[in-house]
Regions:
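Compositionally biased, charged N-terminal/linker segments
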Residues: 1-45, 113-114, 130-132, 136-154
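Short, charged beta-turn/beta-strand-edge "cap" motif at the junction between a beta-strand
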Residues: 53-58
Length: 154
């Protein structure tokens, strides 16, 4: 059984310029690949990931995809940190579905915490493993949410 990972994004810390376009593109079955910070070195090609939006509310899972390149070291996305030698682990993440948290339904973090209290939903770094007992239920919830296009109520 492959692992499922939780990658994170905080818009307050990184301006993801392609975000809106990618949200639209994935609805047209386009896939997009980005180098993503991942504190674990264990993700393998083919592993699934979910993307959780952090920072200011709303927070929650807004994306899904697969790892297409295993762990490698690359400069930090913050140029100043990279200049100081901060070169964290990365993976290449291929997004197959990305939601615009300002306009679309997504899996709210508070609901996730309530449904799956054993899982960490506010990681201090991107790239933690989703617990084996949580992953299948999370996938089902994600698929149901996508197909109904309705936000799970708070």
């Amino acid at each position: 059984m492959s692992n499922v990972w939780l990658l994170s994004w905080n818009p307050d810390k990184w301006n993801w310029k392609e975000y809106s376009a990618w949200c639209t593109g994935t609805k047209n079955k386009e896939k997009f690949t980005e180098s993503w910070t991942c504190r674990s070195k264990k993700p393998s090609v083919g592993d699934e990931f979910f993307l959780i939006k952090q920072g200011e509310r709303p927070r929650g899972i807004i994306g899904h995809g697969h790892i297409v390149r295993e762990s490698y070291i690359a400069p930090h996305y913050d140029a100043e940190r990279a200049k100081k030698g901060d070169w964290p682990n990365h993976v290449d993440a291929e997004f197959d579905w990305l939601l615009n948290y300002e306009t679309e339904a997504f899996l709210d973090q508070d609901i996730l915490k309530s449904l799956f209290p054993s899982q960490q939903w506010s990681p201090q770094g991107s790239g933690i493993r989703i617990r084996e007992e949580v992953a299948p239920q999370l996938k089902k919830l994600w698929d149901n949410m996508k197909s109904s296009e309705g936000r799970i109520p708070k």
